[in-house]
């Protein structure tokens, strides 16, 4: 995404860089300052004590209960349909550019991006609320030197794309 952003300057690329680095810091950073190798694929759900992808999947009734604004557009944007369910649940992923969402809602791209951010905030809050019935997967505490070295390279690329975000300092801290 860093190289793509340097070539094309699409906001989606910059957002993806920022969100990915934030996720790494929040979920994968170890007390040592290095980054963990992996998360367990399985986590408990209300239906199963060990379900692959359980923390990251949503039932349609859970999504409906969130009372998200523009729910039909939400379902379209994240490809929630009877054909996209995985074992009866949904893995939310963007299937359309923000421009298409703006056109669908008949609003400008900034307002569409605001809608997307609101949906993400509601989903994050709902994830926090269901943490007892669907806890986060366990993090493997192992830190691999080679993978942390790749992260240094990735952070350096992110710094070239977005030099004011401090990614260079993060990369140097791993050296």
What are the language-model segments listed below?
Residues 1-174:
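Aromatic (Trp/Tyr) and acidic
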